[in-house]
């Protein structure tokens, strides 16, 4: 039986307004409401996006009285770190965040030799009900606000600077939630992530990835935003019969519709689409499915696609496990034989439940 999809948040949350919720015009209006001179808007944005400071009491170039005045009105504490765990010799760090209304989400900071990536959540929980994903099995609590999303980015960037003397280079919307089901807030967050300081964090659009299970109309809408970010389509099966079960949204938008939307995205943006495929033993790893995947992707996207094979990560209560390595290698060979680029993704954080499909926001 297909678990019910949830596209609207069961418990809508409205966190207090934060500077990060506002664009340049909104910041100007907020500053004017407080009776402050217009230049303060740019100054506050520089503190947040440029210096990564979210506590006005640390904004030493502001008058002391002003710091107190804006603490609650423009810089409420939206997320509090409830716990942190690390693995990979400290190179992977998972943070459990608690919001003001008590919901919890997780983000993961990963350091690599030539890049630093933060994997962020866009919703508390997820309504897409994928049976192999811990987040999907937990259901959806609510959407995150733009500022709650951006606070995960700011915290990751600040941790890299303060703990490692390093910079954040990549942001991936691959944490908890379906980003395109929280479309307006996610797009607003992306705009702030890629904008140069003091309007945003200044991360290259090419280094930002937005993942989706295949909300075809929203993929097309995102293409028309012309943000230039990477689209990652979580496919996980090349045939509708299996994908209807593994990715229940397929019952609304079939593979052909998702691939048509992905092709539209590639054509409009000029960006290669990433296809995510969690390899599950004896479920979706058969040679004929590798052949079918290669053929369908080559026909739909030509050279504008890359397949990331993901060894299935264990989740509580799941009866499935990862495909054996020889099966994995043969799957890669067959997809490549169809003329499609394919690699196995480096899995980080499995032992601390921080890898793909494992985030459940438990504990803390």
From Swiss-Prot:
Its cofactor is [4Fe-4S] cluster. PANTHER family: 23S RRNA METHYLTRANSFERASE (PTHR30544), RADICAL SAM CORE DOMAIN-CONTAINING PROTEIN (PTHR30544:SF5). [4Fe-4S] cluster binds at residues 126, 130, 133. This is Probable dual-specificity RNA methyltransferase RlmN. Keywords: 4Fe-4S, Cytoplasm, Disulfide bond, Iron, Iron-sulfur, Metal-binding, Methyltransferase, rRNA processing, S-adenosyl-L-methionine, Transferase, tRNA processing. Gene3D superfamilies: 1.10.150.530, Aldolase class I. GO terms for biological process: rRNA base methylation; tRNA methylation. It is found in: Cytoplasm. It catalyses: adenosine(2503) in 23S rRNA + 2 reduced [2Fe-2S]-[ferredoxin] + 2 S-adenosyl-L-methionine = 2-methyladenosine(2503) in 23S rRNA + 5'-deoxyadenosine + L-methionine + 2 oxidized [2Fe-2S]-[ferredoxin] + S-adenosyl-L-homocysteine; adenosine(37) in tRNA + 2 reduced [2Fe-2S]-[ferredoxin] + 2 S-adenosyl-L-methionine = 2-methyladenosine(37) in tRNA + 5'-deoxyadenosine + L-methionine + 2 oxidized [2Fe-2S]-[ferredoxin] + S-adenosyl-L-homocysteine. The active site is at 106 (proton acceptor), 356 (s-methylcysteine intermediate). The gene is rlmN. PROSITE patterns: RADICAL_SAM. It is an enzyme of class 2 (transferase). The keyword Translocase does not apply. Belongs to the radical SAM superfamily. RlmN family. NCBIfam families: rRNA_mod_RlmN. Pfam families: Radical_SAM.
């Amino acid at each position: 039986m297909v678990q019910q999809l949830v596209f609207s948040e069961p418990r809508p949350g409205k966190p207090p307004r934060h500077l990060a919720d506002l664009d340049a015009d909104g910041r100007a209006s907020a500053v004017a409401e407080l009776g402050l001179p217009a230049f303060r808007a740019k100054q506050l944005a520089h503190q947040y996006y440029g210096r990564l400071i979210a506590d006005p009491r640390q904004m030493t170039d502001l008058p002391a009285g002003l710091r107190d005045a804006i603490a609650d009105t423009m810089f409420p504490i939206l997320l509090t770190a409830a716990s942190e765990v690390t693995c990979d010799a400290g190179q992977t760090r998972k943070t459990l965040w608690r919001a003001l209304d008590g919901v919890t989400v997780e983000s993961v900071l990963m350091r690599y030799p030539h890049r630093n990536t933060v994997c962020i959540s866009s919703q508390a929980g997820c309504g897409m009900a994928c049976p192999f994903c811990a987040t999907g099995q937990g259901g959806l609590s609510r959407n995150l606000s733009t500022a709650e999303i951006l606070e995960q980015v700011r915290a990751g960037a600040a941790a890299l600077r303060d703990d490692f003397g390093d910079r954040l280079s990549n942001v991936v919307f691959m944490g908890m939630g379906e980003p395109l089901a929280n479309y307006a807030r996610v797009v607003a967050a992306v705009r702030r992530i890629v904008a140069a300081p003091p309007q945003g964090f200044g991360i290259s659009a090419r280094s930002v990835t937005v993942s989706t299970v295949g909300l075809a109309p929203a993929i097309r809408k995102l293409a028309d935003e012309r943000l230039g970010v990477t689209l990652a389509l979580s496919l996980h099966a090349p045939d509708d019969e299996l994908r209807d079960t593994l990715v229940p949204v397929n019952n609304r938008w079939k593979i052909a519709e998702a691939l048509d939307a992905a092709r539209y995205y590639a054509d409009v943006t000029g960006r290669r689409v990433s296809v995510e495929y969690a390899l599950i033993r004896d479920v979706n790893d058969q040679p004929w499915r590798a052949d079918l995947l290669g053929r369908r992707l080559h026909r739909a996207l030509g050279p504008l696609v890359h397949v990331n094979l993901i060894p299935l990560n264990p989740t509580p209560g799941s009866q499935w496990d990862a495909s054996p390595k020889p099966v994995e290698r043969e799957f890669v060979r067959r997809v490549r034989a169809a003329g499609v680029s394919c690699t196995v993704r480096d899995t980080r954080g499995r032992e601390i439940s921080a890898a793909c499909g494992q985030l459940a926001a438990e504990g803390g």
